[in-house]
Regions:
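Membrane-embedded alpha-helical bundles that constitute the cytochrome b-like, heme-associated redox core
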Residues: 2-257
Length: 257
């Protein structure tokens, strides 16, 4: 029974007797699976559910940088891996029209959205607020205005685009990976293992969402004061937890640092 199962897992998806693929295309597939199939789901989970960490005394302790540093650093790593993966496929096959087939179309859309995410993050505007995000020291009130703290139009557009593109990227990633595995006639253990990983990530997502861990970014950073610009408007996105507001001023928050 075990031997038969192992044989089935090692057999290509089509049932062919062997699996052969050109080396550049093999590395293209491996790197795209690593970047988009394995690394991207936990990065989204960290960004969505760990703006406040489990041991953090929130809202007394605000602006935990863990989620942002992790999301930004690993997001750039994912972008670099995708770039190398695309270099391999161009070296192996040369240029093909994005409309060549479903996999090619989905793959180029994934690359485009990765670029949108990276470029958008560079253009998101200034931070603002009563505490300098780099030195962690209080700032005078004259320096508080910023795109994020003041929720300017620039910041609002960024949030809609960044979050919307992120979830669209997930859908297209599933399509690109599935069609890529079929096109490569990959051994069956690959879609089985990748599917198990995504099911586990989906279970973690649902569990954290039901636990109320998707805390509003603005409140996670600047607290519950009802007078703050971001607390006077609805959060952008779905399933976001907005805690009851309290009368703690941003000046008091800055003085606690």
């Amino acid at each position: 029974m075990i031997a038969e199962l192992l044989h089935w897992l090692a057999t290509p998806i089509s049932g062919a007797s062997d699996h052969a693929i050109a080396m550049p295309l093999a590395w293209h597939g491996r790197l795209m699976v690593l970047a988009m199939g394995l690394l991207t789901p936990p990065l989204i989970i960290v960004a969505r559910f760990f703006k406040v960490t489990p041991q953090q005394d929130w809202p007394r302790q605000l602006d935990n940088p863990f989620w942002f540093i992790t999301h930004r650093r690993w997001g750039h790593i994912v972008g670099a891996i995708v770039a190398v993966a695309m270099a391999f496929v161009l070296a192996g096959r040369g240029w093909e029209s994005p409309l060549h087939n479903v996999h090619t179309a989905a793959g180029w859309l994934v690359v485009l959205l990765v670029l949108v995410q990276l470029i958008g993050s560079w253009l998101r505007g200034t931070h603002g607020g009563p505490v300098d995000p780099f030195t962690r020291k209080p700032r005078p009130a004259a320096l508080w205005p910023g795109d994020h703290y003041s929720m300017t139009r620039r910041r609002i557009i960024f949030e809609y685009m960044h979050k919307g593109a992120g979830y669209l990227l997930l859908v297209l990633t599933v399509l690109a990976l599935c069609t890529g595995l079929i096109a490569a006639d990959a051994p069956r253990w690959m879609p089985v293992a990748l599917g198990a990983w995504w099911i586990m990530m989906a279970a973690v997502f649902v569990s954290l969402q039901r636990a109320g861990r998707c805390i509003d970014t603005y409140q996670a950073i600047w607290g519950l004061n009802p007078d703050l610009p971001g607390n006077r408007r609805r959060p952008i996105g779905f399933g976001i937890v907005r805690r009851p507001i309290t009368n703690v001023s941003p000046r008091e928050r800055a003085s606690e640092k």
